Amino acid sequence: AASDVYKRQTAYIVFMLEAMADIARILGKDDDRRLYEKNAARARKGYSALVTTKKFSIDTDRQAKLVRPLYIGLLDEKQTEYAKKRLIKALDNYSWRLGTGFLSTPLILSVLADIDIEYAYRLLENEQMPGWLFMPKNGATTIWESWEGTKAQGGIASLNHYSKGAVCEWLFGTMCGINVTGENKFKISPRPGGHFEFAEASYDSVYGKMFVRWDKTDGGYKYKISVPSNCQADIILPDGRKQTVGAGEYEF
C-alpha cells in the first residue's frame, strides 16, 4: 500500500538525517548539524501524523511495522509501550519465527533485547524456518540468501549472503558485549541468556585481540575478559557491576 511506502521511507529519512546530524556535530560543522536536525524534526512530525491519523496501524502482526519505529524511536511513550506488547503478540502468533524482511531483520534482536533479553534469545534459538538456527540444523556452513536454502522444486538459492548475516553484529555486540568506542577504547557489556551454556567472541584491534567469554554456572554466570595492550575497557555486567580497566586479563 502507498501508506506503507510513505511510512517506511519517512522512517529511514529520520534515521539518516539524525545520523548525519550526529556526524556533523562530531566534525564541528554546526550549520550542517542544525540543518539536518531541522529536517529530521520535520520528518518525525510527518511520521507521527501517519500514525495518529491511522493511515497505518501499529495493531498488526507484521513484525517489521513494529520493529522499525521501535528501533528508530519514532513513537510516543504510549505508542511505544503498545508496540512492544504488540510485537511480542505478533511473535507468539507466528510461533516465534522471524517475519521481518531485508531491512528489519538486522534490528529485531536489539529491539527485543531492550524489552527483555530472554525474548531476544527465544527468537535466536528458534530452529524452525524462518530462523537463523534452521540453517546450521540443516547443514549450512554459511548464511543463506533465502531461509529455506533449497527451493521446493529442488533449485538452490545463494548459499552465501549477508542480508540475514547481520545477526553476527548482535552476537558480538550484545550476546558477548564487545563494542568499540574509540581507537583503543571499548565498552564490554555481555548479556547472557537463553539456553546457551557459554559464548565467546574476539575482536582483532590494531593493538591486539579483545576477548570475551561467559559461562553458565550453577549460581549464575562467570566472565573472562582479555584487554589488549594500550587499551581501556569500560566493563558493565548484567548485575550492575561497572569497572574501567586497562590491558590485562580479568575474571568476574
Which residues make up each language-model segment?
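Hydrophobic alpha-helical scaffolding
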Residues: 7-10, 33, 37, 58-60, ...
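Acidic/polar, glycine-enriched structural segments that form the non-catalytic walls/loops
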Residues: 24-26, 31, 248-252
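Generic helix N-cap/helix-start motif at coil->alpha-helix transitions
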Residues: 60-66, 99-104
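Well-ordered alpha-helical scaffold segments within catalytic/enzyme domains
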Residues: 12-29, 67-78, 106-115, 173-177
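Extracytoplasmic/secreted proteins, especially bacterial periplasmic and envelope-associated proteins
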Residues: 12-15, 19-22, 35, 42, ...
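Non-catalytic C-terminal accessory modules of carbohydrate-active enzymes
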Residues: 38, 118, 122-252
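Long, well-ordered core segments of solenoidal/helical folds
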Residues: 37-56, 76-96, 115-135
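Short, small-residue-biased leader/transition segments that mark boundaries at the very start
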Residues: 2-6
